Regions:
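Transmembrane-helix boundary motif in ABC transporter permease subunits
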Residues: 102-131
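Generic hydrophobic transmembrane alpha-helix motif, especially the helices
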Residues: 132-168, 175-176
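Transmembrane alpha-helices
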Residues: 159, 163, 195-229, 259, ...
């Protein structure tokens, strides 16, 4: 005959078995992909694209479309690149310093102008279309004016870099503010946010995805403007990527010229991936946005 103590012990034993079963299931859950697998999954498409580009490049050289001293293949170009890598890195430092300095100033100007235009109907009516017009204007068209105003100097390049980047930054912020949900602004007003607090805690965070897109585009315009400027405005004593590109072209050293082009391309890719790509991923995670590039 079962006693109450025996029944209680049986129930306790059954509960222990069920809990241990749950623990077993929990420990047996399949783990996610390893870090190496994640790195490989992210890297192989890029590596494949590089290999395909190199193969196509070499096939074009082999086709005899141009003599190999005019269009060298990957091997002599990479030999020139690694053979003089220190010089290219020094030149890249000069170019990047110019680029970041101009972009930082454009960031300040573009943010201020974008915030004012987005929140002021009169300003939007007066200069809204002008900002878009400045954004579409080729950077090379500014250099004659820049040289007239600032002579052949760093300021001439700085002037064009700022004009290349600021309109895109301003338009990115304007677009982000225009697409803010009205309920967020009403909630900020109810909670007592006014002017600067409204902009700092409500408007800017809500507009951040579009604003970062504007920053990314602004950097692209700044980088293109900068390299165009270094090809046109040659400053003695300032060894830059643009100057090195022009010198190699003048000397007919086309392998070295293309090596500089590769350095310029790699810098553009790295800045986009490490700076803007990282910012975009963090914003997507923070705002719960879907990564359209995934799956």
């Amino acid at each position: 005959m079962a006693t109450p103590e025996n029944g209680s012990a049986a129930r306790t034993d059954l509960l222990d078995r069920e809990l241990s079963g749950l623990d077993h299931l929990e420990t047996e859950l399949p783990s996610g992909p390893s870090r190496a697998a994640r790195i490989w999954a992210a890297a192989w498409p890029k590596l494949s694209a590089i290999v395909i580009a190199l193969v196509v490049w070499q096939l074009v050289v082999w086709s005899g479309w141009k003599p190999d001293y005019i269009l060298p293949g990957p091997v002599p170009v990479f030999e020139a690149l690694f053979g003089d890598l220190g010089t290219y890195m020094s030149a890249a430092g000069t170019t990047l310093l110019r680029g970041f300095r101009g972009f930082a100033f454009a960031l300040v100007i573009g943010t201020i102008v974008g915030a004012l235009v987005a929140r002021n109907r009169v300003l939007r009516s007066a200069i809204g279309s002008m900002i878009t017009g400045l954004q579409t204007m080729p950077s090379v068209a500014w250099f004659p004016l820049a040289i007239v105003l600032f002579k052949v100097s760093e300021n001439a390049i700085f002037f064009v870099v700022v004009l290349g980047a600021a309109p895109s930054i301003a338009n990115g912020l304007i677009s982000g503010i225009d697409n803010i949900q009205p309920i967020l602004l009403r909630a900020g007003t109810v909670l007592g946010a006014r002017r600067w607090k409204m902009f700092r805690h409500v408007i800017l965070p809500a507009a951040l995805p579009s604003f970062v897109g504007g920053l990314k585009q602004g950097w692209a315009f700044a980088w293109r403007s900068l390299l165009a400027g270094e090809l046109i405005v040659l400053i003695p004593g300032k060894f830059s990527l643009g100057q090195q590109l022009d010198v190699n072209r003048s000397l007919g050293d086309y392998s070295a010229m293309m090596a500089v082009m590769i350095v310029i391309l790699v810098i553009g890719i790295l800045v986009d991936a490490l700076l803007f790509g990282t910012a975009e991923r963090k914003i997507r995670r923070r705002y719960g946005l879907v990564d359209t590039a995934a799956g």
